Amino acid sequence: MVHITLPGLLLCLCLYLSVAPANPLNAHARVSDTTAFPLPNEGHVVAHDPSIVRHHEHFYLFKGGIHIPVFRASNLSGPWERLGTVLNGPSLVQKQNQRRPWAPMVTQWKNRFYCFYSISQNGKRNSAIGVASSDSVEPGGWTDHGPLINTGHGPGSGVYPFNVSNAIDPAFFADPITGQPYLQYGSYWKGIFQVPLAEDLLSVENATHPNTDHLVFLPKKKPKPNEGVFMSYRAPYYYAWFSHGQCCHFKTQGFPKEGNEYSIRVGRSTSVHGPFVDRDNKDLLNGGGSVVYGSNHGKVYAPGGLGVLPGANGEPDVLYYHYHNASIGFAQGDARLGWNYLDYVDGWPVPRAPSNPGNSLQPPSSVSLQIVAFLCLVILFTL
């Protein structure tokens, strides 16, 4: 007869806790166990809607949050040092949530840095995209110029496309062929748009009647969860990237049906103006978009809020994004930075598996728990 002792039970419990997830997977979250997508390289930093620029052998990460936090690292996998914030106080945009801008996008243009950011509320079109600029990418020298575009209310909000869209999730792109700068933006409602910017990036070119490109739309579906646009170029194609699905608020709004959470999608075109089509030649204005990266391995959930860093020093392009680690949690503050190098197959971007397994997120495994069960049996029979 086996005599189960209290010390034996306590030791078994300690062994179990040492390998069990810190925050067990919520029973309502359906995290795909597909291996069709590679695991991410871990960024080792909490970040929702990250924007990353490379400058002087360092990476600078900007994320949504109070006054737009700024981090610096010499490697995309960290360690990241928090430097401060872009803004010194509330945004000059006169709308709610002035202290906590969303989804910043930072770029360098003609020896000056620009930070485009969103001011909005969940589920509202009364939004604005603001812009700040600085001679330095680091905190301390940024000047807030206030709103660039308004939707819902405010100057210019009655002009197309601002009268049908939602001014959040800004992205900047300079056409490498013509040099023309563009702003891409949009979320839900009528989808994602592109407008040309003036040379100083502080206003829309021909603001009362901008030369508008409609890039992404879901014409027959409600809701219309396309947002988080990013434009990149690799000759001969322009790539319109976006996030599709429910991004967040899983604790308050619940988990969507599997496959309806965030995923990263793309279309391509030989013109910056489009039309953009996916692998099946479906127009992004008709609900198209090839899935480049989605939930995977029972561990990675709802990747999105993406950007693409052009390759440097012979390295490939980098796809970076935020995602939720199912072993950690699904709150807004649990979103983490992930990244993968990109290969291009027949002109389509494909994320590359991490080359350093020690830096990648590891899928859940039952092996550790099986070992614990065996050790517990040994302990119970010997104590």
Curated annotation (Swiss-Prot):
What does the entry list under GO cellular component?
plasma membrane; side of membrane
Q: Which residues form the propeptide?
A: 357-383
Q: Which reaction does it catalyse?
A: Endohydrolysis of (1->5)-alpha-arabinofuranosidic linkages in (1->5)-arabinans
GO process terms (BP) = arabinan catabolic process; xylan catabolic process
Q: Enumerate the residues marked as the site Important for catalytic activity, responsible for pKa modulation of the active site Glu and correct orientation of both the proton donor and substrate.
A: D169
Q: What class of enzyme is it?
A: hydrolase
What does UniProt list as catalytic?
D49, E227
Q: Which residues are glycosylated?
A: N75, N163, N206, N325
Locations listed in the record: Cell membrane
* Name of the protein in question: Probable arabinan endo-1,5-alpha-L-arabinosidase D
Q: Which classification does the entry list for the species?
A: Eukaryota, Fungi, Dikarya, Ascomycota, Pezizomycotina
Instruction: Point out the gene that encodes the protein.
Output: abnD
